[in-house]
UniProtKB/Swiss-Prot annotation:
It is found in: Cytoplasm. Keywords: Cytoplasm, Developmental protein. This is Maturin. The lineage of its organism: Eukaryota, Metazoa, Chordata, Craniata, Vertebrata. PANTHER family: MATURIN.
Amino acid sequence: MEFKELVDAAEKWCTGNPFDLIFAEDVDERRLDFYAEPGISFYVLCPDNLTGGTDNFHVWSESEDCLPFLQLAQDYISSCGKKTLLEVLDKVFRSFRPLLGLPDIDDDTFDQYHADVEEEPEPDHQQMGVSQQ
């Protein structure tokens, strides 16, 4: 994806959350820097498949306070399959929700999917054993 398209997608993503895109650089590295109050910052290095650069996105923060919260997003990026910039940014946003003072979102879709399903009781099975005759 062209870097300009990534910048446009990042700017659009910022309209739905507290983060602002504060810097976009395409010279040395395809880097997007984001910031939100109270002092939450991170950057995304974007893949550059055209010139043989990195294959995956990479997220990081210069802030020691922010780094532990990025672990979820880093694990997500390194998991199987290609990710889009919006998928990565959404995962970062979920990771930072506690720092932003927002309620935590349960990211476990399995539990959400089965939340309305009532479990049927297991049928009683007769004991199998040696009969005494």
